[in-house]
């Protein structure tokens, strides 16, 4: 069991690192193109892809951190149930995150809401998912690269804060 747990942790961490590498690489490529002339359409298309990656990253990391939390705290059967019930979580706007977190501990949500950056976290998630859904359904999305980059940074900070809240 210990070997399997170590393997799962390594795989989860590998998924996190892979997402972050892909996102950071794409940010670097777009920054390079921003310094050139006449690449607006390419930057726009890459930004849409970046939006989708950030949404996927958000979903994977939320599940990862919840699984990590109850890894050593729950009975194996309960752990399996919890893991299966959250693994296909999508469209993680703040209301959905709050709803899921309340099922574990309402204090987590109360603490997060007191964070000075809470509204920025919420707005970033809203922007990412509104635009991801527009892109996925063929609608026009005017989200800019800088806005995406800022949202990504805020989402990373949100997860840092969430981990602290869950650990306290």
Task: Spell out what each predicted region is.
Residues 2-47:
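Charged alpha-helical initiation segments
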Residues 143-168:
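C-terminal structured interaction module
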Residues 13, 17, 41-49, 119-126, ...:
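Short, solvent-exposed segments of well-ordered alpha helices
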Residues 27-30, 34, 61, 132, ...:
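A structural signal for well-ordered alpha-helices, especially hydrophobic packing surfaces
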Residues 35-38, 66, 70, 137-140, ...:
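Short, flexible helix-adjacent loops and helix caps
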Residues 71-142, 162-165:
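Flexible secondary-structure boundary motifs
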Residues 44-67:
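Short, hydrophobic, well-ordered secondary-structure elements
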Residues 17, 24, 52, 56, ...:
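Generic structural signal for well-ordered, non-transmembrane alpha-helical segments
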């Amino acid at each position: 069991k210990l070997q399997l747990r170590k393997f799962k942790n390594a795989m989860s961490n590998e998924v996190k690192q892979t997402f972050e590498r892909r996102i950071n690489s794409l940010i670097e490529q777009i920054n390079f193109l921003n310094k050139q002339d006449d690449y607006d359409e390419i930057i726009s298309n890459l930004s849409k892809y970046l939006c989708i990656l950030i949404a996927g990253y958000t979903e994977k990391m939320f599940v990862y951190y919840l699984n990590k939390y109850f890894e050593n705290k729950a009975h194996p059967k309960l752990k399996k149930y919890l893991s299966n019930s959250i693994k296909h979580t999508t469209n993680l706007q703040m209301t959905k995150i709050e709803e899921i977190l309340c099922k574990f501990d309402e204090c987590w949500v109360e603490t997060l809401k007191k964070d000075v950056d809470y509204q920025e976290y919420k707005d970033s998630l809203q922007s990412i998912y509104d635009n991801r859904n527009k892109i996925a359904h063929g609608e026009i999305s005017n989200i800019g690269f800088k806005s995406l980059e800022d949202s990504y940074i805020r989402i990373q900070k949100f997860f840092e804060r969430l981990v602290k809240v869950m650990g306290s």
